[in-house]
Each structure stands twice: as C-alpha cells, then as structure tokens.
Regions:
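PLP-dependent class I/II
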Residues: 1-207
Length: 207
C-alpha cells in the first residue's frame, strides 16, 4: 500500500501524481480515488481526473473511484462523474456510488458498481458470486425510490447544508489560530489546527 500525500495550497488540497509516481515500485495494481474527496471536500476538476486516467493508463493500473458523495455538492459547484470525462479512452476502472450517504439510508446496505471493461467486470462478478451474497431487496427499493422521487428533498438538503457550512466556517474563523477549509461538497468539515502549535494529541484532548 502506497500513501501519496496531497499538496495543500491556499487552503485547498491538490493531487500530487509526481509524488505517487516516485514512490511506485513497479508491482502496483490499483489506484483508489475518492471523488469528491473525503474529508477535504474537493471536487476534482475535469483536467485533474483526466490526469489520473492518463497516469493509470501509463502504468497499466486499475482505477477504483469512490463517488459516494457525488450528490452532496454545494449548489454553486458541479461534480462531473468520471465516465463522462474519459469516454472510450480509458475503460480500466471501477466506479462505486450509492444513495446511502445522500439520503441517509445506510441501513439499506446497497450500492452501485459500474465497470465498463468486460474482462474486469466478469472477474468482479465471479468474485462477487463466490461470496454467496445477494442484493438487499429492501435496499434496492429504498435506492430506487430515493433516485426517482428524492430530487426536491435533495435540493432542500443541499441549501440547508450550505447554510450550516457558512455558519460553521464563520465561527471557526473567529477562533484564534484555527481555519476551516473551503468545502465544495459532502456534509463534513475540515479544520486546520496546525497554527496552534499544539500536538495532535493535545488538540484531541481539548476537543
């Protein structure tokens, strides 16, 4: 497992594919991309996602993309799902989504997996069938109803979350040495304690 630290610039996270490439040993098989990013909330741009696709194709890597937060995007932002960007250029990816985060129905234990590469999809299906697991019927119904009828509810939720974020950011900025990262998506917050001069454990105890 290789961990590639992102670059923090102007209070935002950016991918560092050069750093990742320098750490590679040549036996890597998979790259995992969280899009939008959790917990930093970054929505990767079209160009950033294209760069990841080029990187994976160059090194013959399977790209696993977690887009579970793709619906929880601030009203003023837009998330572009990976398949719409790469078209037929790069098909060696596994895209995972779910309605569970967006509609708070994690108890349904349901998700979606999209694999355009036929060979890779066959391998995935065989491995999945071998587990003996079957889809959760209740979860399937929950997900379908949410996708078909939940648009108005989701629009209201996103506006509500944006107001919460604005209030949270304002209050955090009023606290000396703390700053809140600007979040494009998700319902999470990411606060920088580095200027306090305290250790991670000390800050944890204070919280």
């Amino acid at each position: 497992l290789i961990e590639s630290e992102m670059i923090k610039k102007n209070g935002r996270y950016y991918l560092d594919l050069d750093n990742l490439e320098n750490k590679m040993k040549g036996n890597e098989k998979v790259v995992i991309l969280c899009s939008p990013h959790n917990p930093g909330g970054r929505i990767w741009t079209k160009n950033e996602q294209i760069e990841v696709a080029y990187f994976c194709k160059k090194h013959n890597l399977i790209l696993i993309i977690d887009e579970i937060h793709n619906d929880l995007v601030n009203p003023e932002n837009k998330h572009i799902t990976f398949p719409k960007i790469v078209d037929d250029y790069f098909q060696n990816f596994i895209l995972m989504t779910s309605t569970t985060k967006t509609f708070n129905i994690a108890g349904g234990l349901m998700g979606n997996v999209i694999i355009p590469n036929n060979s890779l999809r066959d391998k995935f299906q065989k491995a999945n069938f071998a587990t003996g697991e079957t889809p959760n019927r209740f979860g399937m119904i929950l997900g379908e109803v949410a996708m078909r009828s939940g648009h108005k509810w989701l629009d209201d939720l996103l506006k509500y979350l944006k107001k919460n974020k604005d209030v949270f950011d304002k209050e955090i900025e009023s606290i000396k040495y703390l700053s809140s990262m600007r979040i494009d998506s998700t319902y999470l917050a990411w606060v920088d304690f580095s200027k306090t001069g305290d250790s991670e454990n000390d800050n944890y105890k204070k919280l």
